[in-house]
Amino acid sequence: MTKHIAILRGDGIGPEIVAETVRVLDKLIEQGLDAGYEYAPLGGEAYDEYGHPYPEFTQNLCRKADAVLLGAVGSPQYDNLDRPLRPERGLLAIRKDLNLFANLRPAVLYPELANASTLKPEIVAGLDILIVRELTGDIYFGEPRGIRVLENGEREGYNTMKYSESEIRRIAHVAFQSAQKRSKKVCSVGKANVLETTELWREIFEEIGKEYPDVELSHMYVDNAAMQLVRAPKQFDVIATGNIFGDILSDEASMLTGSLGMLPSASLDENGKGLYEPSHGSAPDIAGQNKANPLATILSLAMLLRYSLNDEA
């Protein structure tokens, strides 16, 4: 049965790196991969065409597709738009719409890039970490949120950090199952000493961990985890954490490899459908110059084949 891929070029270097990746996809289809694809806009490209970063046309295509491949979103020209209309909101919206709750971010050091890392080679040689980040909850989506004026006339910004038990359970299973295919270690990262949200996170990880006796579970406060990633990163196998902490730690871990531009990522739902994109941004400063490296997007295609199409091509 033919699988359908929605391809979102996005902004900045997105169209360039996607074009090179589609060349690879076309070759695989020529060689027998039973898949087809269709393009749709997201982010700034979508705003220019439809007035919204995640328009109905794109929603319908992505909902029907078996997997989604994205270039990148974001450009300074949209920074003055109302927040709900900015390109990045399109990315948040598609994750929420498709219920893509599990973000897998590998941080692997290729031997050829050992000297590009800012850490000593002996610290990072052989590095292979997987960060499993929960994507649909936490402070990015918690309500209430906003900016209000207090009685004394001072403005106050406020957000809500929260996680439900079911949200934590499903990301815990992803983390433990990922570890079973690797070195069988999960480090749960939070701030349970001051945040009740991550106190519950820790309790549930302990509970779920009993279902995976072959996997070693440890816990670490996020500030210590950020330090340990620089001090001794090879102690980690799978790091499991919430949305905001994962956002920060995954970028930190990626730079240990010498180049953010070489790493793919996957965001999955409970059935294996996913959004696949490079870990780097839209790099508008080099857009249109044909010098953006497409490798991270090509590797994202490889993850798409593995996780959503069950094909190791």
From Swiss-Prot:
Reaction(s) catalysed (UniProt annotation): (2R,3S)-3-isopropylmalate + NAD(+) = 4-methyl-2-oxopentanoate + CO2 + NADH
Gene Ontology BP terms: L-leucine biosynthetic process
EC number(s) reported in the record: 1.1.1.85
SMART domains reported for this sequence: Iso_dh (SM01329)
Membrane-spanning ranges: none
Cofactor note: Binds 1 Mg(2+) or Mn(2+) ion per subunit.
Keyword match Cytoplasm: yes
PROSITE patterns the record matches: IDH_IMDH
InterPro entries noted in UniProt: IsoCit/isopropylmalate_DH_CS, IsoPropMal-DH-like_dom, Isopropylmalate_DH
Compartment annotation: Cytoplasm
Entry keywords, A to Z: Amino-acid biosynthesis, Branched-chain amino acid biosynthesis, Cytoplasm, Leucine biosynthesis, Magnesium, Manganese, Metal-binding, NAD, Oxidoreductase
Site entry (Important for catalysis), positions: Y140, K191
Cofactor: Mg(2+); Mn(2+)
GO MF annotation, one: magnesium ion binding
Family (UniProt): Belongs to the isocitrate and isopropylmalate dehydrogenases family. LeuB type 1 subfamily.
Oligomer status and interactors: Homodimer.
Protein name listed in UniProt: 3-isopropylmalate dehydrogenase
